Amino acid sequence: MQNKDKYVIWHIQGGLGKNIAGTALCASIKQKYPDRKLIMVVSHPEAFLSNPHIDRVYALGNAPYFYEDYIEGKDVIIFRHEPYNQTDHITKKKHLVNNWCDLLGIKYTQQQPAIYPNYTQQKTIGLWQRPKPIMVIHSGGGPMQGQKFSYSWTRDMPIEIAQEIVKH
């Protein structure tokens, strides 16, 4: 008997910030493909856990029997695009999420990242509340695969500039 499940597989490889940005589009993908299960294969699965729009999350390199379970003989749509390599991103004409929308065939509606805390996280959320807004600076993209040094002038903010921002 053949599996009648339909799948959308979205593969995201990159840093935590890129994965968090990807959370902005999970609801849009499910809206476009309501009859399909959304399967994520990502480098930071913790950003996608508890997301009600996702049916299954796998860490890159930790998806045994994935081909047999989701691809071989199945009705599947696979998205494995690199939005950072798109002209409009490189030339700073469009935001990362907007470029992803183009690649995924989704209308850009200024979607925002969505993190869904689990039960334990919800119970401890008060520990993070402050009387004023919290700003997070992610000054480095991290080393690329095979990169000799951890700093890359094309991806990382110089430490001196990051330190000045923190001071003010």
Region locations from a protein language model:
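Catalytic machinery of carbohydrate-active enzymes
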Residues: 1-168
